Amino acid sequence: MGLVFLGPPGSGKGTISKIISNEFKYHHISTGDLFRENILNSTTLGKEIKKIVEKGELVPDQITIKIVKDKIKAIKKNDNFILDGFPRNICQAEALDKFLPNVKIINFLINEELVIKRLSGRRICKSCNNIFNIYTLATKKNGICDVCKGDLYQREDDKEECLKTRLKEYKLQTKPLIEFYSKCSRLNNVDASVEIDEIKKKIIKIMLKKN
């Protein structure tokens, strides 16, 4: 089974993806993780992606589609998977339908103010990559990781002005996509402002529902 998680940055897609992946043995394919992996490894695409995200812009379709397709090809044929953050527009959706038809589409709904608060407070450990939040998951010592004592940092694209740019572009690009899936009755909306356990229950219900 394939699941597609749609929603703005900070809507909880990544957190829920990891929970579902661990409990139900799904592969979690996150475009954000794939981008960061390429940036970290300084691949040709990674260098290009880094310049784009630091400006608060969305990565072009041709790059995103290639990275996602390559990842899916590396997965066993009958394994379950979650696509987190892909597709993001009609072009990507059409590409997805060509090589992965009949996936279930789940859209995470959340207001912009809550997204900005969640992401502007996010801090990441430079050493072990654990994620904390100064508002919801603060460390015992300011700026220091609770796990490995490494230094924490804030991603450039998590700063408020950059977030506003990202959210504006997200809305412009994904509105037609949401309408596209709504018209063909494939869209399952989930309130992402509630507690994680509540979101999880709703996702499982959708997973069990027949197409």
Curated annotation (Swiss-Prot):
What is a biological process (GO) this protein takes part in? AMP salvage
Gene Ontology cellular component terms for the protein in this record: cytoplasm
Q: Which residues bind Zn(2+)?
A: 125, 128, 145, 148
Pathways involved: Purine metabolism; AMP biosynthesis via salvage pathway; AMP from ADP: step 1/1
Q: Which superkingdom, per the lineage?
A: Bacteria
Residues binding AMP, per UniProt: 31, 36, 57-59, 85-88, 92, 155, 166
Record keywords: ATP-binding, Cytoplasm, Kinase, Metal-binding, Nucleotide biosynthesis, Nucleotide-binding, Transferase, Zinc
From the Swiss-Prot or TrEMBL record, give the protein name. Adenylate kinase
Q: Give the organism the record lists.
A: Borrelia garinii subsp. bavariensis (strain ATCC BAA-2496 / DSM 23469 / PBi) (Borreliella bavariensis)
